[in-house]
Amino acid sequence: MAKPETENPYSKTVLLPETSFPMKADLAKREPGQIKVWKDQKVFLNMKEIRKSKPSFVLHDGPPYANGNFHVGHSLNKILKDIIIKSKTLSGYQTDMIPGWDCHGLPIEVQVLKNLGKEARNTGPSELRKKCREYAAEFVGKQGEDLNRFLCFWDENNKYLTMAPEFEARIVEVFGSLFAKGYIYKGKKPVYWCIDLATAHAEAEIEYQNHVSPSIYVKFAVKGETDTHCLIWTTTPWTLPANLAICFNEELPYSLFQSDAHGRLILADGLKEAVEQKTGITLTKIKSLSNADLKQMVFLHPFLDRESIPLFGNHVTLDAGTGCVHTAPGHGTDDYRVGTAAGLPTLSPVDDYGRYTDEFEMMKGIKIWDANPKIVELLREKNALVHFSEFTHSYPHSWRSKKPLIFRATPQWFFSIDHNGLRDESLKAIDKVQWIPDWGITRIRSMVESRPDWCLSRQRNWGVPIPSFTCKSCGLTHLDDKTIQHFIQIVKKEGIEVWYEKEAKDLLPADTKCSNCGSEDLKQDKDILDVWFDSGVSSFAVFGDSIGKEPADLYLEGSDQHRGWFQSSLWPSMAIRKTPPYKSVLTHGYVLDEKGHAMSKSLGNVINPTTDIINQYGADILRLWVSTQDFRDDVKIGKDSIKTVSEAYRKIRNTFRYLLGNTSAETLTWNLKKEELDTIDKYYLHKLAKLNDEVKKLYDTYQFHQVYHKILGFCTVDLSQDYFEIIRDRMYCDAKESKTRRSSEYTLAVILEVLSKLLAPILSFTTEEVWTSFGKKDSVFYSDFSDLTEWLDESLESKMKPVFETKEDVQKALEEARKLGKLGKSLEAEVVIDGKKDSLPFSSEELALFFVVSHVHFETNGIQEVFSEWKGESGSIQIRKPKHFECPRCWRHVSETEGKLCKRCDEVVSKLSPN
C-alpha cells in the first residue's frame, strides 16, 4: 500500500488567491436575480439622478412593432443602444433613452383578424380596434420582458406607445400643424396599392422580390396612316385598358422602320437592334421622324374605341423597350406627371381589390392578374401583339401580405415634400448631420432627392384617423384648421375612439356646413394615418415641438431605416421645427446565420435570442457577442460564434477571478504614490492608462468590436500571460506587508476597478457581480470611467522594450530546452545572457522575476549543464541547470541547502505567527 503524499509544511504560509467569486458563471440562472436587484434599488433612475447636473446625452429609440417576441435582430439593436447609454453614463453624461413601441398598423390588424377567424366578418370597427389595442398591449409587455432579460436599463414607467391616448392626440396635433402650414393635401394620384389588403402602401412598406411578368410588344395604329404603328413594350398588360397616351423623349432620335411581318413600326433608333433580338423580327429603316412628326400623330387603342395622344418626358430612356412608352396616368408616377401636365384624366378602371370596374366593361369583375393572359389573347386576336415572352425582374411586394403591389390612382392624403422648399432645406440639413457609417449620407440624400410626395392615408381600421369629413349631399371632402383644432381638444379629453363612437356633428365645431352646398349633414371619413407618420412624430411626443428644440443626440437603427424612420422623422421635424430630429445617425446591418444566409423559418436557421442563447448561456454572452461584431455591416451568428464568445468570456472571467483573489476595494484606500511602486507595476499601470484612454475613445465612436479586442488582449496577454506570471512569486511568497507585494496588490486593485468600469456597458451582470465581490457598496453604474493620466509615462515604454524583447528570446530558448527533454518548469532553469547588459537596467533578481526563471547571469563562465542555447536579437541566450537547490516554499532554485527554505522565504516564515 502506497504511503499518502506528505503535505508540504509551508503550503499554509503561501498567500494563495482567495475569493468567493465563482469560476462557473451560471449566468442563465443568476442574471434574473440581479435584474430584480437593479429594479428594487432603482439603479437606472439613480444613475440618472446623480448625474442630473451633467451634460445630457439623448438616444431616441425607434419603436419596434408590438407584434411577436423580439428576434435576434432586435437584440442586436437594443443591446447596442444599451451599451451606448451605459458607456455615456460612465463617461459622465446624464443619459436618457425612452423605449417606444409602434402599436398601430397592418401587422397587428392582420394578426387580430387572423385570430378572429370567421368571427372577423361580424366584428365592427370599434370592437376590432379594441382587440388590436389588447393585442398590442400584450406584446408590449412581452417585449418589455425581453428588454429586461437582455440586461437593458430602462424605466418601465416611462415608455412611449403610439396607441397611448396622449400620443394619439399628439399625432393629430402634428398633422394639424402640418395642415396649417400647407404641407397636407388630398389628391387622386397613383400610389403603391395592395389588392390583397385593400390599402395604400408607403415606400418604406415595400419589399422587392423576384417576380415573373408577361413581356409584350404591342402595336398602336397611327390614325390616318395605312399599316403604320407605334411599337410599345410593357410588362403590365392589365394596365392597357387605362392607356391614354404614348410617351417619347425629345432628346432621342426616332424612325419609321419596315418590319417583315408587322408593317411599318415607329421606335427609337437606339433600340432597333435590341427589339430585333428580343422579338425575332427584322427591321429596315425607312426614314427618320422629327419631334414635330411625332407631335402631330394620334394613335388608336388596340382593342378599345379610344385614341391615345403623343407626349414627351425625360423618363423615357434606352434602357429597355422601344423608346415609345405606354402611358396610363392612373397607374404610374411618371405617367401621372406627364399625363396631368397635358390635361389627361387619371383613369384607373380597377377597384380596391384589383377587379376591373365598369370603366372596362368587357372584363368587369375580373382580377387584374387573371386578366393578363386574357388581354394578351385579345391583342393577338386584334393582330396587335408583336411578341410575347415571360420576364423575371425585381418587383415591389407588400411587406405584410408578401404579394405583388400595383400602382393605382385613388384619392389619398399626401404630405408635400416640395412645399415651402422643404426638400431643398432637408438636403441642406442632412449635410450637417453626422452619418455613421459615412456612406449613410449618400444613401439618404439620394432617397430624399428622388422621393415622391408621402402618401399618408391608409384604408384600414387600426390607426389614428385622419380627421376629415365628407358631405353626404355633394360628396365634398371637408377639412380645415378649425375642424382639426376642435377635434384635437376632444381627443385630449376623451381619446381617439370618439371618432368611431360618436356622430360627425359631435366632432365638428358648431354650425359647421359644407362649403360647397351648405349642407350640415357630414360623415366621418374612414382613412387612417400611415403608421410611419405615427413613429415619425415620436420626437414631438417625447421631446416637444418648439422651433429650435434641441434634437436627439443619436438615432440608431438598421440600415433599412434610411428609407423608413430616418425619413419619416425628418420631414415633420424640418417642416415644423426647421431642424432635423437628430444630430447623429448610426446604422447597423442585418443578423444572418453563420453561412451568411438570412434567417427564416423555412430554412430552419432562426436563432431565438432568449431560448437559444440567454436561457442556455446567459445574456452577458449575447451582449459580449454583440460587442464582437463590426455591426455597421451585416453580422453572423450561430453555435460556433457563440462558442467562441463563451470561451472569450471565460478568459475575462478568470482574469477577474484572479484579481479578486489577490486584492480588494480596501486596497485602493492605500493611495500609493507613483514613487512607491515598483517599475514593473508602474509599467502595467501605464499600459492600463493607455488602454483606458483608447477604450473611452472607442466607446465615443461606437467601435465596440475594438473595445472587445483591446480588453480581451489586455486580459489574456498583458495580464494573464505576462504580468500575473511576473508577480506570481511576490504575491504568493513575499511578506504580506512587504513593499513589493503591496506595490503589486495595489496595482491589481487599480486594474480591477478600471476593468470593471470599462466592461460594465457590455458585461453588465458580470461587472456588477465583480464590483460587489470587490467590496464596493454601490452599483458600478454609479461610477465614472477612471482618469488615469497620473499613471501615463511613455519613458517606461522605452525602458521596458528591451526587457520584453529579451524575454521573447528567453522563451524561445526555454522552449528549445523543453523539446530536448531537459526542462520542465521554467523555474528549474537559470538564464545566461551574453551581451546587451547595458540595455537591461534591472538587477539580475528583477530580471529573473520578469522571465519567471530562478537566476539571470551575464557571464558565460560556469560548470552547470547547458540545456539549450538560442541566438536572438538580444544576443546569445543559454539555458542552464541552476547551481542552487529548489526552495520547498516558492519552488525557485535559490536555496543554498537542499530541502531548506531560501533566504527570503525563511525570513517570511519566521515572522509568521505559529497560529
From Swiss-Prot:
L-isoleucyl-5'-AMP binds at E557. It is an enzyme of class 6 (ligase). It comes from the Bacteria. Its EC number is 6.1.1.5. Its main location: cytoplasm. Belongs to the class-I aminoacyl-tRNA synthetase family. IleS type 1 subfamily. Monomer. This is Isoleucine--tRNA ligase. The lineage of its organism: Bacteria, Pseudomonadati, Spirochaetota, Spirochaetia, Leptospirales.
